[in-house]
């Protein structure tokens, strides 16, 4: 997928780039698969900001995606590739012989006219097919991986992402995550074959503040530009550096400090991600 750039007619256009949308074939979305999501803008039920630098953004409707892929042994046909405002990957509209319509994440290489199928048993290894991890050959790249059987895919769902099946041990399959983390996942969990499409999304340059405002991202103020009452880095005459290690507004060390709490599932992690 090509990246489209612009001539610098204005300063904001100079570094801005967008994805070419020639791969999008749909003129409109399926009404029955659209729903509204309440925009919280980073506020909780008391109206207080719990996540900074967020706002409403442009109005959009949520597309209901079939992450479970639980329509087994029925072949569906891809009739459209669509844009989804809630994710950076494209979505594919699949129509089944009984008239059922579902959206799935579009893997790289899946196009209009292709057939997809999901099954609890074994299938051919083709892009867009979904099956249980125990039936997928070692070395295959997969996406939309479940963490609990029947819960729906939760891993490797964004544009260009994929995980690789590295081996099996008892009732578990060993997966190498996009972060290079190695972990066990129950072999009864479902996964889809292939790499999530729209891989060039990572190369897009936002270029101007207005595009981020449309995405619901507000400006972020540096702590060193604040007063001491507002941030540990605040205060001082002129551009004063921080004393000690950088911290968050609440004093938690920044830049690599581990804040993840221990979980029962830690025993399923074989090795952590490798830092570049």
Curated annotation (Swiss-Prot):
Annotated spans, Disordered: 212-276
GO biological process, one term: cytoplasmic translation
Matching Pfam families: Ribosomal_L2, Ribosomal_L2_C
Positions with biased composition (Basic residues): 257-276
Keywords from the named record: Ribonucleoprotein, Ribosomal protein, RNA-binding, rRNA-binding
Alphabetical list of SUPFAM superfamilies matching this protein: Nucleic acid-binding proteins (SSF50249), Translation proteins SH3-like domain (SSF50104)
GO molecular function terms listed in the Swiss-Prot or TrEMBL record: rRNA binding; structural constituent of ribosome; transferase activity
Listed InterPro entries: NA-bd_OB-fold, Rib_uL2_dom2, Ribosomal_uL2, Ribosomal_uL2_bac/org-type, Ribosomal_uL2_C, Ribosomal_uL2_CS, Ribosomal_uL2_dom3, Ribosomal_uL2_RNA-bd_dom
GO cellular component, one term: large ribosomal subunit
Function: One of the primary rRNA binding proteins. Required for association of the 30S and 50S subunits to form the 70S ribosome, for tRNA binding and peptide bond formation. It has been suggested to have peptidyltransferase activity; this is somewhat controversial. Makes several contacts with the 16S rRNA in the 70S ribosome.
Subunit note: Part of the 50S ribosomal subunit. Forms a bridge to the 30S subunit in the 70S ribosome.
Similarity annotation: Belongs to the universal ribosomal protein uL2 family.
Protein name from the UniProt record: Large ribosomal subunit protein uL2
Organism: Helicobacter acinonychis (strain Sheeba)
């Amino acid at each position: 997928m090509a990246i489209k750039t612009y001539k610098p007619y204005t300063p904001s256009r100079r570094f801005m780039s967008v994805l070419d949308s020639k791969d999008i074939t749909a003129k409109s979305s399926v009404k029955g698969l659209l729903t509204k999501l309440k925009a919280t803008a980073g506020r909780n039920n008391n109206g207080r900001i719990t996540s900074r630098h967020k706002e409403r953004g442009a109005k959009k409707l949520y597309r209901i995606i079939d992450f479970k892929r639980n329509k087994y042994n029925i072949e569906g046909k891809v009739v459209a590739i669509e844009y989804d405002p809630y994710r950076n990957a494209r979505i594919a509209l699949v129509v089944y012989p009984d008239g059922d319509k579902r959206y799935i994440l579009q893997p790289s290489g899946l196009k209009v006219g292709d057939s997809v199928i999901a099954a609890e048993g074994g299938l051919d290894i083709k892009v867009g097919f979904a099956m249980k991890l125990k039936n997928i050959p070692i070395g295959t790249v997969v996406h939309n991986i479940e963490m609990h059987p029947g819960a729906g895919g939760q891993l490797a769902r964004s544009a260009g992402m994929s995980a690789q099946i590295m081996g099996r041990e008892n009732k578990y399959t060993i997966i190498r995550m996009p972060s290079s983390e190695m972990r066990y996942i129950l072999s009864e969990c479902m996964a889809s074959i292939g790499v999530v499409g729209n891989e060039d999304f990572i190369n897009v340059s936002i270029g101007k503040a207005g595009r981020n405002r449309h995405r619901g991202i507000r400006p972020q103020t540096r702590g060193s530009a604040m007063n001491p009452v507002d941030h540990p880095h605040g205060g001082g005459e002129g551009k004063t550096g921080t004393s000690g290690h950088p911290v968050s507004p609440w004093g938690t060390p920044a830049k690599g400090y581990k804040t993840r709490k221990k979980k029962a599932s830690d025993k399923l992690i074989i090795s952590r991600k490798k830092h570049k």
